[in-house]
């Protein structure tokens, strides 16, 4: 099954970005700062289920950190989006993608790991297409963990996941990438700017739209 997983917002200042999401949108970032070997650090905002918004900033040296630094040279903004699948090998083979491994070190010393495909593809790094991810979760505890994380945030309203994404990309290209059976709430639009444009988080009473 293919499902929307998370979206990535690039920032030069994690704390300032977390404050902005809290003040403007009522979305509370988790306090923990994760650090990645590729030269980035993050804070996450749980938005329902296992979905989340990742605030990502360059940290130290590393190829990914340098890429993020270039992308946000003109200001903070949306970078990437991802989908999760339990058939990563199949999707990677179908699209001719290499599978790579990733990990994050949490502040308590534990390490989270995953495998992904497509994160270096040109159309993905422009933000139009999603990269694929499959988490290492042998005990099946990931939904429970994200449930606790959501409970830790004080947003003042129930969050029900991402209602939709708006992406500047041609719909046939997106359909070819995801496959005809994928039911992902993505609006492909004609835009002067490629990539992720807007994200809507669902609540019982309204949608929180973030540009």
Functional labels for PLM-detected ranges:
Residues 3-12, 43-48, 53, 66-158, 182-211, ...:
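Vicinal oxygen chelate
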Residues 12-72:
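Glycine/small-residue-rich interface belts in oligomeric ring/scaffold proteins
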Residues 15-28, 90-95, 170-181:
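Amphipathic alpha-helical segments
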């Amino acid at each position: 099954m293919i499902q929307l997983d998370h979206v990535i917002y690039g920032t030069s200042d994690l704390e300032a970005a977390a404050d902005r999401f809290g003040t403007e949108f009522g979305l509370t970032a988790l306090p923990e700062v994760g650090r990645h070997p590729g030269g980035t650090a993050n804070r996450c905002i749980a938005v329902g289920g296992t979905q989340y918004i990742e605030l990502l900033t360059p940290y130290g040296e590393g190829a990914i950190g340098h890429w993020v630094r270039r992308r946000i040279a003109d200001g903070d903004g949306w970078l990437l989006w991802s989908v999760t699948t339990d058939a990563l090998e199949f999707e990677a083979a179908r699209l001719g993608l290499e599978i790579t491994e990733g990990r994050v070190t949490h502040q308590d010393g534990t390490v989270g790991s995953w495998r992904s495909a497509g994160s270096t593809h040109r159309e993905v790094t422009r933000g139009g297409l999603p990269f694929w991810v499959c988490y290492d979760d042998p005990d099946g505890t990931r939904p429970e963990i994200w449930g606790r994380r959501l409970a830790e945030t004080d947003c003042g309203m129930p969050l029900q996941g991402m209602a939709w994404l708006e992406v500047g990309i041609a719909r046939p290209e997106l359909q070819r990438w995801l496959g005809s059976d994928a039911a992902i709430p993505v609006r492909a639009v004609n835009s002067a700017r490629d990539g992720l444009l807007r994200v809507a988080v669902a609540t019982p009473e309204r949608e929180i739209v973030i540009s």
